[in-house]
Amino acid sequence: MPHQQMLILFGLLPVATNISTWWNFGSMLLACSSMQVLTGFFLAVHYTANINLAFSSIVHITRDVPYGWMMQNLHAIGASMFFICIYIHIARGLYYGSYLNKKTWLSGTTLLIMLMVTAFFGXXXXXXXXXXXXXXXXXXXXXXXXXXXXXXXXXXXXXXXXXXXXXXXXXXXXXXXXXXXXXXXXXXXXXXXXXXXXXXXXXNSDIDKIPFHPYHTYKDLLMLSLMVLMLLMTVSFLPDIFNDPENFSKANPLVTPQHIKPEWYFLFAYGILRSIPNKLGGALALAMSIMILLTVPFTHTSTIRSMMFRPIMQLMFWTLVATFMVITWAATKPVEPPFTMISQIASTIYFLFFIMNPIAGWIENNIMKDN
């Protein structure tokens, strides 16, 4: 066993003292993931992947299985917590230049894609009204991609419509994809540990390192307990806050809900998809909205790693965060004049961030050279 792994094993990994609470979200993601696997297991035990029985089995879990309501709400709200944590985790990586650890960043982005796929399969498994319509829409969008994709969609979901085979495939795929995501997470963690984390101040912090245990373990535990508190309070008092009222009726392929909107964590990608009138273009933009994260390590031009001392980049970063929220909000609205325009402008600004990133770095380098 290499020396470094040995250190990690005993929690003696040297870590910079100045990494802030933004670095705690990785451990929270691990906790979310473990909880999703556990609750998902107990739900899957009682779930029936049949088009006629899926909805009834969900109702049965909620009403008849001991603590089934708790498992279901923990699983549903845990997914939302998971996505909140992962979005913060990515934003922190963007802000502090963590993406310059290319291996870690690329494995993490693949993880994000896998996670979104898994969450989608999980949502489709319930066979409720909103879920069925969303599944149909996603299948249609996937089929739009290319000539080959139609065959692939048919192979995966068995038909264009959500049929019994689709529910079975989605239930199995949610379980399989979660296991694959756990494996990829291990790879990401190993890659992250091998190259040490970026210090926030972007200076070399070798002289100022402390052991991970007990200092950062307790710091992680604090944020973790806060997250668990939020989770349990949400599950107890507002279990349906992230839910769609349409999900309380059984899926009916003949009746389309008035506003088909996915879970909140997909709204951002969905808003970008919707802002483009062309079907193929929308599907491409949807893929690009996530894939563009892969380009960030290769377009970093600034001589400074972190955004902490880069005011222009800070402005752009917070604009990006605001844009993300605006797209998420606009995607919940119907497709009508003001909202379509807002979506289009916000999507343009979102993509502009990644194009402006190298240009701003170049400008800042020139400014610093002159002084």
Curated annotation (Swiss-Prot):
<dbReference type="InterPro" id="IPR027387">
    <property type="entry name" value="Cytb/b6-like_sf"/>
</dbReference>
<dbReference type="InterPro" id="IPR005798">
    <property type="entry name" value="Cyt_b/b6_C"/>
</dbReference>
<keyword id="KW-0472">Membrane</keyword>
<dbReference type="GO" id="GO:0046872">
    <property type="term" value="F:metal ion binding"/>
</dbReference>
<dbReference type="GO" id="GO:0005743">
    <property type="term" value="C:mitochondrial inner membrane"/>
</dbReference>
<comment type="function">
    <text>Component of the ubiquinol-cytochrome c reductase complex (complex III or cytochrome b-c1 complex) that is part of the mitochondrial respiratory chain. The b-c1 complex mediates electron transfer from ubiquinol to cytochrome c. Contributes to the generation of a proton gradient across the mitochondrial membrane that is then used for ATP synthesis.</text>
</comment>
<comment type="subunit">
    <text>The cytochrome bc1 complex contains 3 respiratory subunits (MT-CYB, CYC1 and UQCRFS1), 2 core proteins (UQCRC1 and UQCRC2) and probably 6 low-molecular weight proteins.</text>
</comment>
<keyword id="KW-0813">Transport</keyword>
<dbReference type="GO" id="GO:0006122">
    <property type="term" value="P:mitochondrial electron transport, ubiquinol to cytochrome c"/>
</dbReference>
<keyword id="KW-0479">Metal-binding</keyword>
<feature type="transmembrane region" description="Helical">
    <location>
        <begin position="339"/>
        <end position="358"/>
    </location>
</feature>
<dbReference type="InterPro" id="IPR036150">
    <property type="entry name" value="Cyt_b/b6_C_sf"/>
</dbReference>
<feature type="transmembrane region" description="Helical">
    <location>
        <begin position="218"/>
        <end position="238"/>
    </location>
</feature>
<keyword id="KW-1133">Transmembrane helix</keyword>
<dbReference type="Pfam" id="PF00032">
    <property type="entry name" value="Cytochrom_B_C"/>
</dbReference>
<dbReference type="Pfam" id="PF00033">
    <property type="entry name" value="Cytochrome_B"/>
</dbReference>
<keyword id="KW-0349">Heme</keyword>
<feature type="transmembrane region" description="Helical">
    <location>
        <begin position="280"/>
        <end position="300"/>
    </location>
</feature>
<feature type="transmembrane region" description="Helical">
    <location>
        <begin position="105"/>
        <end position="125"/>
    </location>
</feature>
<feature type="binding site" description="axial binding residue">
    <location>
        <position position="89"/>
    </location>
    <ligand>
        <name>heme b b566</name>
    </ligand>
</feature>
<keyword id="KW-0408">Iron</keyword>
<dbReference type="InterPro" id="IPR048260">
    <property type="entry name" value="Cytochrome_b_C_euk/bac"/>
</dbReference>
<feature type="transmembrane region" description="Helical">
    <location>
        <begin position="170"/>
        <end position="190"/>
    </location>
</feature>
<keyword id="KW-0496">Mitochondrion</keyword>
<dbReference type="GO" id="GO:0008121">
    <property type="term" value="F:ubiquinol-cytochrome-c reductase activity"/>
</dbReference>
<feature type="binding site" description="axial binding residue">
    <location>
        <position position="188"/>
    </location>
    <ligand>
        <name>heme b b566</name>
    </ligand>
</feature>
<keyword id="KW-0249">Electron transport</keyword>
<feature type="transmembrane region" description="Helical">
    <location>
        <begin position="69"/>
        <end position="90"/>
    </location>
</feature>
<dbReference type="InterPro" id="IPR005797">
    <property type="entry name" value="Cyt_b/b6_N"/>
</dbReference>
<feature type="transmembrane region" description="Helical">
    <location>
        <begin position="312"/>
        <end position="332"/>
    </location>
</feature>
<dbReference type="InterPro" id="IPR016174">
    <property type="entry name" value="Di-haem_cyt_TM"/>
</dbReference>
<keyword id="KW-0812">Transmembrane</keyword>
<feature type="transmembrane region" description="Helical">
    <location>
        <begin position="25"/>
        <end position="45"/>
    </location>
</feature>
<feature type="binding site" description="axial binding residue">
    <location>
        <position position="75"/>
    </location>
    <ligand>
        <name>heme b b562</name>
    </ligand>
</feature>
<keyword id="KW-0679">Respiratory chain</keyword>
<protein>
    <recommendedName>
        <fullName>Cytochrome b</fullName>
    </recommendedName>
</protein>
<keyword id="KW-0830">Ubiquinone</keyword>
<keyword id="KW-0999">Mitochondrion inner membrane</keyword>
<comment type="similarity">
    <text>Belongs to the cytochrome b family.</text>
</comment>
<feature type="binding site" description="axial binding residue">
    <location>
        <position position="174"/>
    </location>
    <ligand>
        <name>heme b b562</name>
    </ligand>
</feature>
